[in-house]
Amino acid sequence: MMRHLLTLFDLTPQELRQILATAQTLKAKLKQGERPAILERYTLALLFEKPSLRTRVSFETGMNHLGGSSLFLGDDVGWGKRESPSDFTRVLGQFVDAVACRAKSHERVEQLAEYNAVPIINSLTDLCHPCQAIADVLTLLENFGEVKGRHMVFVGDGNNVSRSLALACAMLNIQFTLARPDGYELDQPWLDRILAKYPNAKMNQTADPIAAVQSADAIYTDVWTSMGQEAESIARRAAFKNFQVNEQLLEAAPKTARVLHCLPAVRGEEITDAVMDGPQSDVIEQAGNRMHAQKALMIQLLRPEWIAENIRV
């Protein structure tokens, strides 16, 4: 059966741990100058409807490290414009071995998976951002060795990033708290789906960020206004003004707490320069972990036998 990664629900907790262990192994090898050509002769298509820095570069560089190749497909290919979605998708699958898709709507990625005979990777949609969440928990794992029982606090919106992060935390037995203004909660259908799959998950939402971070192992934030929400920017700035990750908030947290941000950041809004560039920040390392996490994910989808033979969890 063809494997896709549309959401983290497509992975088991054991598979997620295997991906994390593989990412750690590949990262260690790269630091030693080793680039095992595990995906030699494989080609990845990057099909993007939205602009990107980290996602595009991390996938392209990661595929290069693994001995494979990649090609970028932008608006000029006419996805959904010049021919039927099923024709476009099935033809694309004749030329490449996998597709990483960054789409405006999650339905577009589901459509790709419905018609395609190669693995589809959701590299960002309006619903969720699974690749980011894998990099996030990889960063937590690097800091603490074991993530079970740790506490992740997301200060911000119940958006695509926090949806995937909440699910990743449930899969790995990490407590998850969303600190947000009223009206910006995680949607109940998503929470219900997580709790139906992982009934022992510890998940909370609060409008008090100071209280939320007092037992935090990681404090995570994101922009207050995402792409496509520009018309809401004034209302959002007003709603989130007391949810900035700043020095005052960090003082309420344990000294060992790490600071995360998926980037790009609007410095001075959701996070201050002092915190983002401070000693507790792992933001840049977290961004770099996108590549290592995605390399491991591509191996999981394209050559799972390599992980079975070489990685122990």
UniProtKB/Swiss-Prot annotation:
Enzyme class, first EC level, given as a word: transferase
Where does this protein hold carbamoyl phosphate?
Answer: 102, 129-132, 262-263, 290
- Location in or out of the cell: Cytoplasm
Any one Gene Ontology molecular-function term assigned to this protein's record: amino acid binding
Residue ranges that the Swiss-Prot or TrEMBL entry lists as coiled coil: none
Q: In which pathway does it act?
A: Amino-acid biosynthesis; L-arginine biosynthesis; L-arginine from L-ornithine and carbamoyl phosphate: step 1/3
Q: Which reaction does it catalyse?
A: carbamoyl phosphate + L-ornithine = L-citrulline + phosphate + H(+)
How is this protein annotated for GO cellular component?
Answer: cytoplasm
One biological process term from GO is: citrulline biosynthetic process
Chain sites annotated for binding L-ornithine: 160, 222, 226-227
Keywords for this protein? Amino-acid biosynthesis, Arginine biosynthesis, Cytoplasm, Transferase
Q: What is its EC number?
A: 2.1.3.3
Could you say which protein family the record assigns here? Belongs to the aspartate/ornithine carbamoyltransferase superfamily. OTCase family.
Instruction: Cite the HAMAP family for this sequence.
Output: OTCase
**Tell me, what does this protein do in biology?**
Reversibly catalyzes the transfer of the carbamoyl group from carbamoyl phosphate (CP) to the N(epsilon) atom of ornithine (ORN) to produce L-citrulline.
Protein name per Swiss-Prot or TrEMBL: Ornithine carbamoyltransferase
Q: What is the originating organism of this protein?
A: Rhodopirellula baltica (strain DSM 10527 / NCIMB 13988 / SH1)
